Amino acid sequence: HHCADPACLAGCPAEAYEKDALTGAVIHLDDACIGCGYCTMTCPYEVPSFSDRLGIVRKCDLCHGRLTAGEAPACVQACPTEAIRIQVVDIDAAGTSWGLAAGPDPALTRPTTTYTTTRPPVDRPSAADLRPQPGHGHPALAGLLVLSQWAVGAAAAGRPALALTLALAASLASVAHLGRPLLAWRAVLGWRHSWLSREVLALSAFTPLAAAAALTADRLPLRVAAGATGAAVVGCSAAIYAVTGRRWWRLPRLLALFGSTAAVAALAVAGLPLAVVAAAALAKLAVEGGVIRHRSTARGERARTARLLLGPLSAQVGRRLALLAIGLAVLAAVPAAGIALLIGGDLIERGLLFRAASPDKMP
C-alpha cells in the first residue's frame, strides 16, 4: 500500500516517513524511527510492522531502488502467475474505489492499490465478526494515558506535588513504550502534523508548570497555566487515537472518557464527599460501557468490541469493576489506598481500550 494520503506519514512524530514525488512510494526511514509503533495504528491496512529484534517499524518501500533503476519490484518479478502489476495511477481517483467489498474505508488514506477479484458476500458477518480476537494491551501507553490524566486532575484539585509525581511517571511510561528510547527527542519533530508530537509538547509544558506550582508560594497563576496545558494534554491524547478512524475511538467518546478520568481524579484527590466522586465514576463507567449496546449487531467494529468485552475480556472487565468498587469503598477512610485502587482500575480500563479495539481489516 502506497497511499495518496498516507496516514503513517501524517501520524509519525519522528519524521521517519517520506513520500517520493515521482513514484508515489511511501518510504520508511529506519534511522529516524524511534519505535513508537503509532504508524501501525494509523495504517488501516496493517502494512507497517514492528520488529521486536530491531526496535523499529519496517515497511515495504515498493523496491524504490528498483523503480528508480527502471526495474519492477521484486514481488512483481517473482510472481509466477503475474498476479501483481505496477502501473501509473490517477491520483485524483485514488481511494474512490479499489475493488474490495469489505475492508477499511479507502477514503481514510486514498490507497492507490486496486484489487481485481471476486467480491466476498457483504450480507453475512465474517469470521472476524463472529469470533473477534483481542489485540495488544500496550501497557506502557495505558500507563501514560492514565497517569497523565490523573496528573491533570491532581493539578486541578490544587495538589501540584502529586501532579508533578504523576506527570513524571507518565513521562517515564512514554519512554518505556519506545523501541529506541535514546531517540525519544525525535518525538517532537512532527508537531506540524502529528498529534503524538503535540501530546509530547503539551506534557513537556505541563510537567515543569506543575513543578513550579509545587515549589512557589504564589501558585494561582501557575495553577491556571498548568490547567490549560493539562487540558491540552487530554485533548491531544484523544486526537492521537481518534485520527486512526476506529469507530470505538471516535473523538467525542475519547474526550468524554479521558476528560472524565481527569475529573474523577480531581474529585478524589480534592477529598470531596464520596457521593460526588461515586457519581462522577459512574458517569465515566457509562462512557466505558456504552459500546455494549451493540452486542446484538450482526457485524461491524463496535459489535466486535462488545463481543470481546463480554467474552474473552470479561474477566478483565470484572477486575476493573472490582477495583473501582473497592477503591470507592475505602476512599474516605484511607484516601491513599482508595486513589491507588482507582488508578489501578483505570489502568485495566485503558488496557481494554486497546485490547477490545477491533477495526475493520483487509479480508
Which stretches of residues belong to each language-model region?
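Ferredoxin-type iron-sulfur electron-transfer modules and their immediate structural context
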Residues: 1-26, 30-36, 40-42, 46
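Flanking helices and flexible, charged tails adjoining ferredoxin-like Fe-S electron-transfer domains
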Residues: 4, 32, 40-141
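Short, highly charged, low-complexity non-transmembrane loops/tails of multi-pass membrane proteins
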Residues: 102, 301-306, 357-363
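N-terminal signal-anchor module of multipass membrane proteins
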Residues: 110-111, 115-158, 164, 168, ...
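Long, contiguous internal "core" modules enriched in hydrophobic/ aromatic residues
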Residues: 135-139, 143-149, 157-160, 193, ...
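Membrane helical hairpin/interfacial module
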Residues: 159-205, 209
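Juxtamembrane/interface segments at transmembrane-helix termini
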Residues: 178-181, 287-297, 351-360
